[in-house]
Regions:
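Beta-propeller domains with acidic blade repeats across secreted/periplasmic ectodomains
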Residues: 1-272
Length: 272
């Protein structure tokens, strides 16, 4: 069944994939992790899942997951894995940091250019062997992966941006933004080219406890909200567990989602 869901995605057939963890937040001595990705299907198209199956197993706290054209990408512990649609498992990259299970690679998101972006917090250090050499990220930052060639670019190392990033989003112009679990939103685009000169990105808006971000643009939303940010706020009570912040950060709209305070929101996504 579904236990401690960490990530949810849908494929083009409407199937839901849920990354779950029984051992979160850490493994007990002598225990072999067997976390799973559960696939839920609506066979009779009534809007409710009527079939549940294990798509992937043998995982260790899968904090990152994203559906691609050729299968599902899963980040767990120190490894980035790929599962084809038959569930066959392939190790793509290893060497990601696992010093803190709350800050391991997370918040997988596709860019408009077909790159896979994901975050890591400042409690881990990564040294990943790639076909292009070692890709290192020693503190909080963002990774950009080109899956076809396994080129992995580390961005925002050495506290250039958020200390605990948990979400990346793109607007209609392809600009990138990152959300901080202990801060606000940072404009990520200026740091999209790896550089040796370390300049800290300015923070957009007020600091807070945020997790998950999306840029609004769905046609079923008011036109004046286009380009605004939808973010999760996990610090306060359930009366303030999602916010819509406009582009100029002048107005904040509080959404009531009626979520249990024991569950933190990880990713915000508006379905078009």
């Amino acid at each position: 069944g579904i236990a401690n869901p960490l990530s949810v995605r849908w494929d083009a057939r409407g199937r839901m994939f849920v990354a779950c963890s029984d051992v979160y937040p850490q493994i007990e001595p002598g225990v072999m992790p067997d976390d799973k990705v559960i696939m839920l299907e609506d066979k009779n198209t009534d809007g409710y899942a009527d079939k549940s199956s294990v798509f992937a197993s043998g995982l260790n706290i899968p904090t990152g997951m994203e559906v691609g054209i050729d299968g599902v990408y899963v980040g767990h512990n120190t490894e980035l894995l790929h599962f084809d649609w038959n569930g066959n498992r392939k190790l793509l990259l290893s060497g990601f940091g696992n010093g803190d299970s709350h800050q391991t690679m997370n918040s997988f998101a596709w860019s408009p250019g077909g790159e896979l972006w994901f975050c890591q917090g400042d409690g881990v250090e990564s040294r990943v062997e790639t076909p292009f050499g070692v890709s290192s990220l020693f503190q909080a930052g963002v990774y950009r992966l080109r899956p076809d060639e396994l080129k992995l670019d580390p961005l925002l190392d050495d506290f250039m941006g958020p200390g605990n990033p948990w979400g990346v989003a793109f607007d209609d112009y392809g600009q990138s933004f990152v959300i901080d679990g202990a801060g606000g939103v940072s404009y990520l685009t200026p740091a999209s080219i790896p550089a040796k000169r370390r300049l800290r990105l300015p923070r957009i808006g007020k600091p807070g406890g945020y997790c998950g971000i999306d840029c609004l643009g769905a046609s079923n939303l008011p036109a004046e909200m286009a380009g605004d940010f939808l973010i999760g706020d996990y610090i306060f009570d359930c009366k303030k567990n999602a916010l819509i912040i406009n582009k100029e950060f002048q107005n904040i709209y509080i959404l009531q989602l009626n979520l249990n305070k024991e569950y933190e929101q990880i990713r915000k996504k508006i379905l078009h």
